[in-house]
Design a protein with these regions (language model features):
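A glycine/serine/threonine-rich, flexible loop-to-helix segment
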Residues: 62, 73-98, 138-161
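A short hydrophobic alpha-helix cap/turn motif
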Residues: 17-18, 60-62, 75, 117
């Protein structure tokens, strides 16, 4: 995964340098910010995306190239929407993890990318914009209690889908 980002930057940067600069937005994940046991490769790669973003911003900022990343939480795309329709209590369980009470949509991500590519963010580089409905800002102690209560109240919840 990091090789793809490296190669993309390697071949894009000469073109961006020859013009008026440009913008690169990498896709990381909240798993690059918070780690979960058993996901060593994925989470190491996403942490690497954040590091690579910062390094590229440092290296190529003087050339007028801004480099940022986004770190999405759970995003409800067509495939996952179909799976969650079969498992509404499981989806509610996941949605309850987010302080705003829902999972993200592709539009949430597109809006973040559009902002990072806009003039409104012209002084932002090397930043990872977390788009996660507040998941990464909450203390986990109360979150665990809330989720346990949900399972008690909804014993038929299927968490394997």
């Amino acid at each position: 995964y990091l090789k793809a980002l490296y190669l993309g930057a390697k071949y894009a940067i000469p073109h961006l340098k020859s013009g008026d600069g440009g913008i690169i937005v990498n896709i990381a994940s909240i798993h690059g910010i918070l780690q979960e046991p058993g996901r060593f490769v994925y989470e190491s790669a996403k942490t690497g995306v954040i590091g690579m973003t910062r390094q590229l911003a440092t290296e190529f900022g003087p050339d007028g190239i801004r480099v940022n990343a986004i770190a999405p939480g759970h995003i409800l795309v067509e495939r996952s929407a179909q799976a969650w329709k079969k498992n509404p209590t499981g989806h509610k369980f996941v949605s309850n993890q987010y302080p705003i009470g829902r999972t993200g949509t592709p539009d949430d991500i597109a809006n973040g990318i559009a902002f990072l590519c806009s003039d409104e963010s012209s002084f932002i580089t090397g930043h990872t914009l977390t788009i996660d409905g507040g998941l990464t800002v909450q203390l986990q102690e109360q979150f665990g209690v809330k989720q346990a209560q949900y399972i008690i109240d909804n014993p038929d919840t299927n968490l394997s889908d």
